Swiss-Prot record:
Lineage summary: Eukaryota, Fungi, Dikarya, Ascomycota, Pezizomycotina
Active-site feature positions: 217, 291
Gene transcribed to yield this protein: rhgC
Protein name, as recorded: Probable rhamnogalacturonase C
TM stretches of this protein: none
Single Gene Ontology MF annotation: polygalacturonase activity
Record Pfam families: Glyco_hydro_28, Pect-lyase_RHGA_epim
Function: Pectinolytic enzymes consist of four classes of enzymes: pectine lyase, polygalacturonase, pectin methylesterase and rhamnogalacturonase. Hydrolyzes alpha-D-galacturonopyranosyl-(1,2)-alpha-L-rhamnopyranosyl linkages in the backbone of the hairy regions of pectins.
GO biological process: cell wall organization; polysaccharide catabolic process
Length: 447
């Protein structure tokens, strides 16, 4: 159901849901209306929930008949998916995944591609749907397979209510999307290998909320170009954490609001680039809890491969109400290191309380960054900013209490066996229930 931002939003979300959104998000027509119009049950097209028979042809046939104005239904059960799916040119359509799609072949690119879809919804009606990637078959040997999902050129959409399990590579990529809502999702996989990003998103006007991630790389990451994102109630539970980047040439990111972030052995902010170009501006991170993050708060403009351009202009970043600790005080708890040719400015640290579980001091590191808080220098004139580098050692322990989530992992999941599909979480931030209630439908569209 589309969320209208001019409502009081009592039925949908907190009043401040529009913090960085520029308009309405979500499908224009609800899934029940689509199901009433036309329903395509994949078992009517030859699908068998035996975990062996390839369900791909049945899904493609159902999509062909219901991708305009209808609902494609995957009933409960386990289905083998041995065909890469390209679900394209959907118009006012819904895909209800109440069963499990288990990867059944060795593909090389994308297991499920949803492309050029308008007014579409990909969801689980019983909150038990899942895609099982069996990624351990690759990752235990240091190899990679295909990605689970890619949503490309999708508008007025929602994705919600299911689990993405043990991907052989990336999990969910949202490529050039707009007016979308992404929520009530669980990612669970091997937590010690990179190139396993959970959510990579770029586009315009997107609301991401109530997400839990366990993986070996980035948790919820904004890529360029992106504008008008609200990202809240995020639980990175053994993960790289929430990031911006990495950023190359032509960067254009603005009006991104992260709030209510809970990090267990993950980082809440890692903005990374190395001699790219373009701009990052108007970004907020607030209400953040970090436990054992390697780099809890980091802006690093010398990260990775040198792209060879003039540097990304970073401006107007706000970090507000942060609590927690890093893993080792040999790494700065606060690191804001900007390009000497394009210094950062208008950076604000407000009530940021970061300590360490390793020792009796923390380091702050700042370079070519201007604003207020920590080791930042103040700027009288942003038109002429000098270069500088400074490090501060802090020995005074901040006074704060940072709660823990009961589901925090303390050890990495095994990497040599299939994952059991867990139930959908009922909380993604301490003391908070999901903004949108988990669905418990019986049958297609809940009819």
């Amino acid at each position: 159901m589309q969320v209208k931002l001019f409502y009081t939003l009592a039925l949908w979300a907190p009043i401040l849901v529009s913090a960085q959104l520029s308009g309405s998000v979500g499908p224009l027509v609800d899934f029940k209306t689509k199901a009433k119009n036309k329903t395509c049950d994949i078992t009517d097209y030859g699908a068998v929930a035996d975990g062996k028979t390839d369900v791909g042809p049945a899904i493609l046939d159902a999509w062909g008949n219901c991708s305009t104005g209808g609902l494609i239904y995957v009933p409960p059960g386990t289905y083998s998916l041995a065909t890469d799916l390209e679900l394209k040119h959907g118009e006012s359509t819904a895909f209800q995944l109440d069963g499990v799609l288990a990867r059944g072949h060795e593909g090389s690119y994308q297991l499920i591609l949803v492309r050029n879809c308008h007014d579409c919804e990909f969801f689980s009606g019983n909150s038990q749907g899942a895609v099982q990637g069996y990624g351990y078959e690759y990752l235990q040997d240091g190899n990679y397979g295909e990605r689970l999902f890619r949503f490309q050129d999708v508008s007025d959409f929602s994705v919600h209510g299911f689990a993405a399990i043990d991907s052989p590579a990336y999990y969910l990529v949202f490529d050039t999307v707009s007016n979308g809502e992404i929520y009530n999702l669980l990612v669970r996989g091997i937590a010690d290998l990179g190139m396993t990003d959970a959510f990579d998103i770029w586009g315009q006007n997107v609301w991401v909320h109530d997400i839990e991630v366990t993986n070996g790389d980035e948790c919820v990451t904004v890529k360029s170009p992106a504008s008008d994102f609200l990202i809240e109630n995020i639980y990175c539970n053994l993960s790289g954490g929430t990031a911006i980047g990495s950023l190359g040439t032509g960067t254009n990111i603005s009006n991104i609001h992260y709030r209510n972030l809970y990090m267990n052995q993950a980082d809440a902010c890692y903005l990374k680039t190395h001699n790219g170009d373009g701009i990052v501006k108007n970004i907020v991170w607030e209400n953040v809890i970090v436990h054992r993050g390697p780099y809890p708060l980091a802006v690093n403009e010398a990260w990775g491969k040198d792209v060879g351009s003039t540097g990304v202009q970073v401006q107007n970043l706000t970090f507000r109400n942060w609590y927690g600790e890093n893993t080792a005080n040999s790494r700065p708890a606060i690191r804001i290191e900007c390009d000497e040719d394009v210094p950062c400015y208008d950076i604000t640290l407000d009530n940021v309380n970061l300590w360490t579980e390793d020792g009796d001091y923390v380091e702050w590191s700042c370079a070519n960054a201007y604003g207020s808080g920590a080791c930042l220098q103040e700027a009288k004139d942003t038109g002429d900013l000098a270069t500088y580098t400074t490090a501060v050692t802090v020995t005074a322990t901040p006074s704060y209490s940072a709660t823990h989530m009961p589901g925090d992992f303390t050890t990495n999941p095994p990497s040599t066996a299939p994952f059991t599909i867990p139930p959908m979480p009922t909380s993604f931030y301490p003391g908070a229930t999901p903004i949108s209630t988990l669905l418990s439908l019986s049958g297609a569209g809940g009819l």
